[in-house]
Swiss-Prot record:
Keywords: DNA integration, DNA invertase, DNA recombination, DNA-binding, Plasmid, Transposable element. The active site is at S9 (o-(5'-phospho-dna)-serine intermediate). Belongs to the site-specific recombinase resolvase family. The lineage of its organism: Bacteria, Bacillati, Bacillota, Bacilli, Bacillales. One of its GO terms (molecular function) is DNA strand exchange activity. The gene is resR. This is Transposon Tn552 DNA-invertase BinR. InterPro entries: Homeodomain-like_sf (IPR009057), Recombinase_CS (IPR006118), Resolv_N (IPR006119), Resolvase-like_N_sf (IPR036162), Resolvase_HTH_dom (IPR006120), SSR_resolvase (IPR050639).
Length: 192
């Protein structure tokens, strides 16, 4: 039996392409995850492995859908082989089982390239964040209140205006107002 496994890293990505390819290949059952490959817990993959029986083949669209790094891929494929389950990657067109030396060689090569590609992506992302910080951008949501708002907020609070009223004025929660007040108090304490 051919058992498919599909994975996307974020909720913004879509499984349709992978599932279509797995169906075209003849997979009778498809398991999936919406989770980064860097996470060790992948319930869909775990269910696919539990479901697979000796003689079955687990099929993925691309090798990088299966694992975080070369060591994980090798461990996983060895586990499958020990259970008598083979593995096939559609894009790389490799089948891995104990009987195929060529399949083992290709698997190790493609696993190394998949890990290399992931590391490049991580390096680029890190470099991008560092460059953004150097330009004064720190990511995350923009602040709700600017410096002028904070000055007015502090004045209103010091004059006894209720937190609820202050929060309504800026259309934010009371928690947000308290967070800004704590931030202001911390700044004042640092300045002393």
């Amino acid at each position: 039996m051919k058992i498919g496994y599909a994975r996307v890293s974020t909720g913004l990505q879509n499984l349709n392409l992978q599932e279509d390819r797995l169906n075209q290949y003849g997979c009778e059952k498809i398991f999936s995850d919406h989770i980064s490959g860097a996470k060790s817990k992948r319930p869909g993959l775990d269910r696919a492995i539990e479901f697979a029986r000796s003689g079955d083949t687990i099929v993925v669209w691309r090798l990088d859908r299966l694992g975080r790094n070369m060591a994980d891929l090798i461990t996983l494929v060895n586990e499958l082989n020990n259970r008598g389950v083979s593995f096939h990657s559609l894009e790389e067109n490799i089948t891995m089982d104990k009987s195929s030396s060529t399949g083992q060689l290709l698997f190790h090569l493609f696993a190394a390239f998949a890990e290399f590609e992931r590391n490049l992506i991580l390096e680029r992302s890190s470099a991008g964040r560092i460059a953004a910080r150097a330009r004064g951008r720190y990511g995350g949501r923009p602040e709700k209140l600017n410096k002028q708002d904070l000055t007015l907020l502090k004045t209103l609070y010091d004059n006894g205006t209720p937190i609820k009223t202050i929060a309504e004025q800026w259309k934010v929660s009371r928690t947000t107002i308290y967070r800004y007040l704590n931030k202001l108090n911390n700044q004042e304490n640092k300045d002393k």
